[in-house]
A protein has these predicted regions:
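Gly/Pro-rich hinge or "lid" segments in bacterial periplasmic/extracellular proteins
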Residues: 97, 101, 178, 184-235, ...
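Ligand-site clamp/hinge motif
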Residues: 228-273, 285, 413, 422-424
Length: 555
């Protein structure tokens, strides 16, 4: 999801780039003594520990928004927060491979009861935390119960009634209702030590994962080193230094040769940097717009002490929502806004095994106009459709600090003008966008490695059902998906929730969203560094790229 903590991509002119580059170069140089490059052979952070050979370390520039405010605490949001990734410092029960198939990490085996309400995991008996204490099933139960009970936790374990250790190596997870998407959550929830967890854990984490946190200079960098007591294969990359920089500063650091990998966006994709190549990693980092399906002025949505207006008198008309989906030129949007670095998006999980092929739509502006005109809409002298005195005029809100969303909003407005729908883009801070989330159009960013997003966006009581869609048939499919005995068996039900041949959220159905593009995650990568094959990256341009950093190598 993309909300207040969303990492923004700054609009930078070429003139601004020169000034920003100078500042960024100074910042990068300031860190050079602390983080050496893999091919330059410079000394790595002396204060972080013993010297590490240059062929076994990397320095990565990430956006400033990727520095975890609460530290490296899975019971808050490390690994399992808004932008999911593997926690590196901590172990997880299971993990996923590049094809999103589950693999054991701490788990030796697991099974679900016949009623799908109890998951039983047997874990390894040879795992130790970095302080030398053994990791047992009690630590697993403690972690899950802590997350379930904490108001700070971002991982959703509300379906868990209780986790119970029945022995040192067996833990039972009791559910309030069947929820087989639990495995996707467990794949990013790091296990913390019951004996050492408390205030300050995020700054001084004790874990059992591939890496140890050796140094954290807040606002600047974090250094990880390989865990010598790790139970799995020893990491090939023994030291990982992550420096936090704005995008223009990251490019300056690349030009100065101070980092080995650096995030960037389509804004800078046409740059050429000697000694580096631009890598584009596919993602499910989608951009799309929610379209309220109900008339304005309906029941308000209450969240805490806030009450949000709902409904929209233009998008409440299904022919408008369907016409918008038909008229969008996704290819042009990707070329104009992303410089070609993206793929067309039709749903929240394109490319995932649970995605429905029926979500795809072929552009047809003529058919879109016919839909509107058959429903009684007629173009006025201004070229905008109107009916019963109401013009097809919409305001589209986007995060003012995000140049890509701004450009995408403007492109969408231009395309809708061709159709005959007036769209006025309006940038605002996230706190000013939220009041419109159930009644207006917002340019959202979504996408995770879990089908749970489909549930939250489409279920009648889903926490992110901004469109206000409510359909008992769709709800039943979603409930059935979660109640299946294994993940693979759930795929057809996720797909039917989107379109079963007669109804669903698909463009030919309720058309609750219009999706534009899955944004490629772009990185400058130093020549000679082989970044291991990436699985589809979720929303959030940052930590997911280092999910498999332990298997990177220098050629």
């Amino acid at each position: 999801m993309s909300r207040g903590t969303d990492m923004t991509m700054r609009a930078v002119t070429r003139r601004g780039l020169l000034g920003g580059a100078a500042l960024g170069l100074g910042a990068a140089a300031g860190l050079a003594g602390c983080a050496g490059s893999g091919t330059q052979g410079s000394a790595a952070a002396g204060s972080a520990g013993a010297s590490v050979d240059a062929k076994h370390q990397v320095t990565i520039a990430m956006g400033t928004g990727n520095e975890p405010a609460a530290g490296f605490d899975p019971c808050v949001d490390w690994g399992c927060g808004e932008h999911v990734h593997e926690p590196l410092i901590q172990s997880t029960l299971v993990t996923t491979d590049k094809d999103m198939a589950f693999k054991n990490d701490l788990a030796v085996s697991y099974e679900c009861s016949a009623d799908n309400l109890v998951w039983t995991f047997e874990i390894r008996n040879d795992v130790k935390f970095s302080d030398g204490e053994s990791l047992t099933a009690r630590d697993v139960a403690f972690t899950l119960n802590t997350i379930r009970e904490s108001a700070q936790a971002q991982a959703d374990l509300t379906m868990v009634k209780e986790a119970v250790a029945t022995s040192d190596t067996v833990v039972e997870i009791h559910l309030a209702k069947p929820y087989n998407a639990l495995l996707y959550t467990l794949a990013v929830v790091g296990i913390v030590p019951e004996h050492a967890y408390g205030d300050g854990y995020g700054e001084h984490p004790i874990g059992s994962g591939r890496y140890l946190l050796k140094q954290w200079d807040k606002g600047q960098q974090v250094i990880f080193e390989a865990n010598p007591n790790y139970y799995g294969e020893a990491p090939n990359i023994e030291r990982v230094t992550v420096v936090f920089m704005e995008e223009d500063a990251a490019l300056a650091a690349v030009r100065a040769g101070q980092v080995d990998v650096a995030y960037t966006s389509a804004t800078f994709a046409d740059q050429k940097v000697s000694g580096y190549g631009l890598e584009a990693y596919k993602s499910v980092d989608s951009r799309g717009i929610s379209m309220p399906v109900n008339v304005a002025g309906g029941t308000k949505v209450e969240e805490g002490d806030m009450a949000f207006e709902t409904g929209n008198d233009i998008t409440c008309n299904v022919e408008v929502r369907r016409a918008i989906n038909l008229a969008v030129d996704r290819k042009a949007m990707i070329e104009h806004v992303l410089n070609g670095y993206g793929t067309a998006a039709y749903s929240i999980g394109d490319g995932m095994p649970w995605a429905s092929p029926d979500m795809k739509v072929v552009r047809d502006v003529k058919a879109a106009r016919k839909l509107l005109e058959d429903a009684g809409w007629a173009k006025g002298e201004d070229g905008v459709y109107a009916r019963d005195g109401k013009r097809a005029s919409l305001t589209l809100y986007y995060s003012a600090g995000d140049s890509v969303r701004q450009a995408m909003s403007n492109e969408f407005a231009d395309q809708m003008a061709e159709l005959g729908i007036e769209v006025t883009p309006k940038g605002a801070a996230w706190d000013d966008l939220y009041p419109h989330q159930y009644a207006g159009l917002i340019m959202w960013g979504w996408g995770s490695n879990s089908p749970a997003d489909v549930y939250e966006l489409s279920y009648s009581t889903g926490t992110m059902n901004y469109a206000g869609y409510s359909n008992p048939t769709t709800d039943a499919y979603l409930d059935q998906a979660l109640a299946q005995p294994d993940v693979e068996a759930s795929y057809p039900f996720w797909q039917k929730s989107e379109w079963d041949g007669q109804e669903g959220i698909a463009p030919q159905g309720a058309a609750t969203w219009v999706w534009f593009a899955n944004i490629d995650h772009l990185y400058w990568v130093r020549e000679g560094l082989k970044v291991a094959e990436q699985k589809l990256q979720p929303h959030g341009h940052g930590w997911s790229v280092v999910n498999n950093v332990d298997s990177w190598s220098w050629q």
